[in-house]
A protein has these predicted regions:
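Conserved N-terminal substructure of TIR/SEFIR domains
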Residues: 1-65, 90, 163-172, 176
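Cross-kingdom TIR/SEFIR domain
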Residues: 33-34, 52-157, 161
Length: 176
């Protein structure tokens, strides 16, 4: 039986660090669009002059599920970490999250101790320990979720597998 989740505007919110995966995400976005899956992707859906955080928060609220692409540079971005916390606060077990580990090892150790420790330590200086503690907790929570692990394949060759996974997940929660 499907759990119906209303999608106000977007089927899928794509969270990623554009600096190192934008081309791959562009391919994924095109492939999702070909399947009739409506996505939110920051470069397309944020209008010039629009306040960045409120627009992201609204897009997160208006999405049915989330694909979070963790790459080597993901935690460099405080925006990505803020998105992650917002996604977890919004989902609360009702919306689905698909973590994609792109050239990073999955699991709790990945989330902080090796891959992102330097970035998180730098963020503590700028944002304080309390905020970064929330980010660490969010990373740990998502690191322990089942997801896709991609060690090779740059560009779009991994996209079809993600698209199929998204279609399966949406079929469970979205009314036809």
């Amino acid at each position: 039986m499907a759990i119906l989740v209303p999608c106000e505007r977007f089927d899928v919110f794509l969270s990623f660090r554009g600096k190192d995966v934008r081309e791959s995400i562009n391919n994924l976005n095109k492939d999702l669009d070909k399947e009739g899956i409506n996505t939110f992707m920051d470069s397309e859906n944020l209008m010039m002059g629009q306040d960045f955080p409120p627009a992201l928060k609204d897009a997160i609220k208006q999405s049915c599920m989330y694909v979070i692409v963790f790459s080597k540079k993901y935690a460099e971005s405080s925006w990505c970490l803020k998105e992650l916390v917002q996604i977890l606060e919004r989902s609360r077990g009702k919306q689905l999250i698909l973590p994609v580990f792109f050239h990073v090892p999955p699991g709790e150790e990945w989330s902080q101790k090796r891959t992102y420790e330097k970035e998180l330590a730098e963020h503590e200086i700028e944002f304080g320990k309390r905020k970064v503690k929330k980010w660490r907790e969010a990373l740990t929570q998502v690191a322990n979720m089942p997801g896709r692990h991609l060690q090779d394949g740059i560009d779009g060759d991994w996209s079809p597998g993600i698209v199929e996974h998204v279609k399966e997940m949406l079929a469970k929660i979205k009314p036809k």
